[in-house]
């Protein structure tokens, strides 16, 4: 693999960025510096850490950055569920983003498992 851009998990995480940014347009202004800001950072962290990890020299480093991306995925997923609970998003409007979160999480877990055998 020559580029992180070829990784399907990175491509899916970029789709997630777009889906979350579209969802965030529904947040009230009072959440601009709270949930909005936290969710933007969390969703951007996912493809960023996948890319950074893929660019590192060793499998151990890649696993480290994939673990950070996985943590950001869990953080984002929790924040989306909070938004649903507070009535900011409907379950239906968040369905695409939550589905991508599940898919990305499974891919990251699989990559970590495969890379860990090389350590």
Residue ranges of model-derived segments:
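Short, C-terminally biased terminal segments at protein or domain edges
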Residues: 1-119
